[in-house]
Amino acid sequence: MALKECTKKEQANSYELEVNVDGETFGNAVNRVYKKQVKSINIPGFRKGKAPRHVIEKMYGSEVFYEDAMQDCYPDALYEAAKEAGIKIVSVETLEAIEASKEGFSFKASVVVEPEMEINNYLGIEVTKKSTEVTDELVDEEIEKVRDRNSRMVTVDDRAAQNDDVAVIDFEGFVDGEAFEGGKAENYNLKLGSGNFIPGFEEQIVGHKTGEEFTITVKFPDDYQAEELKGKEAEFKINLHEIKAKELPEVDDEFVKDVSDKETLDEYKAELKETVAKRLQDEADKDVDNQISEKLMELLEGEIPEAMYDNQANEMVREFDMRLRSQGLDMKTYMQYMGMDANALKGMYKEEAEKRVKLRLALEAVARKENIEVTEADLDAEYGKMAEAYKMDVDKVKKAVPAESLTEDVKVEKALNLVKDKAVIK
């Protein structure tokens, strides 16, 4: 395969390539297509799937397998041509075969390529680091979280229902005096103040006592999921059976022994202080990284093809699909449950996809300007980390992850570390 011509078009980041595919490569592709398609071809005098290639070509023409063989060749041919031209293709707009014969074929491709962006003033970026001071209030907040996790619900008889209680109720709803589907339940546990029910529903239970029967009036939101109930006023008959409130444990040495391996409250607070300190440090470091990333994206100059955002969003959807499959789920079921289509799912990742693309391009620009190189030692170290993380043999990792791809990733990581090292942290 060889690049015959590479012409830059008027549109930004657009090129037209003319590529030649040699006879040997094309012939191998034709043979692959023949072996795949012969299984479904019926030729008189031969068992199905057993007709020789030259017989099929004589009956249907010598070019019978050419179209599919060219399709088979396009990906590798474009990859090699782009490599020779020193460009990275992000999308193929058009493909046009020029001529084909047993000596090979030529084609033209209109492509969009990854831009070579500009960036300046990236060394000495100023960022502000969040406070990592551990106060007594923060430690107390952690203790309250643990108390909440170890709480229990107890029946309350001596007061009216209030927010954060669980009300055990029967309810039945009516619109224009008629009961509607899904509007009735018995012994339903409703946490008051949760906002899980129609606006105004929970608020009207607050103040009532166990054993009371009463009626409340609410209005369904205009965007309610059930079309027939949108914007409608409804009455609900309520029977309040029970009020349950959260009972929190006392904070003392016995509580500490129940929830940790410490013996005293002071020891437990000291441990929590260390935990909070680490969390605050991690959060502060992550926030610094985010600030640096945002500044780099702001400094980026150049026009980014929409295809790059689109490709990244598609990749994120594929990653999400793999996570679902690892949990025994599938994308179709998930979308049905969430009430969304493929475009809506992809749209969820649009903003994050744009950030990833911009940051990557910014760091690639930094790497170019700083002449960052990746050594064999760098690659070996990265392969070693990956092998350890995935519990795989290093040689298997090297086969799965091409050195060319890993080199780009390591180069980008080096660029990011350089910018972080030179950042001014206040």
Question: Where are each of the predicted segments found?
Answer:
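Extended, charged alpha-helical "arm"/coiled-coil substrate-binding scaffolds
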Residues: 1-70, 80, 139, 172-174, ...
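Core FKBP-type peptidyl-prolyl cis-trans isomerase
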Residues: 29, 33, 143, 154-208, ...
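Short beta-strand elements
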Residues: 46, 88-96, 184, 329, ...
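Short, conserved beta-turn/loop elements at beta-strand boundaries and strand-helix junctions
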Residues: 100, 114-116, 176, 243-248
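Residue-level marker of beta-strand positions
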Residues: 104, 110, 166, 213-215, ...
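Acidic/polar surface patches and capping/hinge elements
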Residues: 127-151
